[in-house]
Amino acid sequence: MTDRNFSPQQGQGPQESLPEGPQPSTMIQREEMNMPRQYSEQQQLQENEGEGENTRLPVSEEEFRMVQELQAIQAGHDQANLPPSGRGSLEGEDNGNSDGADGEMDEDDEEYDVFRNVGQGLVGHYKEIMIRYWQELINEIESTNEPGSEHQDDFKSHSLPFARIRKVMKTDEDVKMISAEAPIIFAKACEIFITELTMRAWCVAERNKRRTLQKADIAEALQKSDMFDFLIDVVPRRPLPQ
């Protein structure tokens, strides 16, 4: 027989409560645990990518910024007017023409600089005589004491006295000592200067149909070229005859 007052709840033993689902607190904790892990992984990936970029492009930040600016400027220009191939050919032709013109100008400048003042103040065959003198003089200086050359010089004897040259050099208070080569060079320079000035004065005398070289001829020769302006205190300037 059964007891009518029997309650099914009384006959059943204690039942354990089954978790219906994850509690909110546990979900928050798991998310908090996963976030640092994900963040560390992302940070590591970014560092690896940065190291890879640095190994591929070993440039500084300033250079990288300049490259970006140049790319932006190039992207903003309109390239439709002239194709790159045509532009390259035109630039090549222009560069070739300019190089050729520059080469010709350089050669002309060199020739002009060498004999720029040689014929200054002279005309006709007088100018040709002076240019020929300087050409022969340059060739002689370059070939002196060379093997097989006819121009040999021991630099021990000159037309001008070395003692007089040393005395003139010592008039400068800043000159304390004079080497053995200095008077030789000064003597050669003085010899060239006197020879050229004599030739210029002779051109003046011959033009005036005279055979005697006078002081007026030297003064007139000095006035015809600005190379001799340093002698203005020695030889006063006079009006040139018409």
UniProtKB/Swiss-Prot annotation:
CDD domains: HFD_NFYC-like
Cell membrane is among the record's keywords: no
Location of region: Disordered: 1-108
Bias (Polar residues): 1-15
Principal location listed in the UniProt entry: nucleus
Modified residues (Phosphoserine): S7
Cell inner membrane in keyword set: no
Molecular functions per Gene Ontology: DNA binding; DNA-binding transcription activator activity, RNA polymerase II-specific; protein heterodimerization activity
Family matches, as Pfam families: Histone
Keywords from the UniProt entry: Activator, DNA-binding, Nucleus, Phosphoprotein, Transcription, Transcription regulation
Signal sequence interval, chain numbering: none
Subcellular localization, as worded in the UniProt entry: Nucleus
Top-level taxon of the source organism: Eukaryota
Membrane-spanning intervals of the chain: none
GO annotations of cellular component type: CCAAT-binding factor complex; nucleus
Assembly mode: Component of the CCAT-binding factor (CBF or HAP complex II), which consists of one copy each of HAP2, HAP3, HAP4 and HAP5. The assembly of the HAP2-HAP3-HAP5 heteromer (HAP complex I) occurs in a one-step pathway and its binding to DNA is a prerequisite for the association of HAP4.
Its job: Acts a component of the CCAT-binding factor, which is a transcriptional activator and binds to the upstream activation site (UAS2) of the CYC1 gene and other genes involved in mitochondrial electron transport and activates their expression. Recognizes the sequence 5'-CCAAT-3'. HAP5 is essential for DNA-binding activity. It may be the linchpin that binds to the subunit association domains (SAD) of HAP2 and HAP3 to bring these proteins together.
Family recorded in the similarity comment: Belongs to the NFYC/HAP5 subunit family.
Comment field (misc): Present with 450 molecules/cell in log phase SD medium.
Name of the featured protein: Transcriptional activator HAP5
Organism from which the protein derives: Saccharomyces cerevisiae (strain ATCC 204508 / S288c)
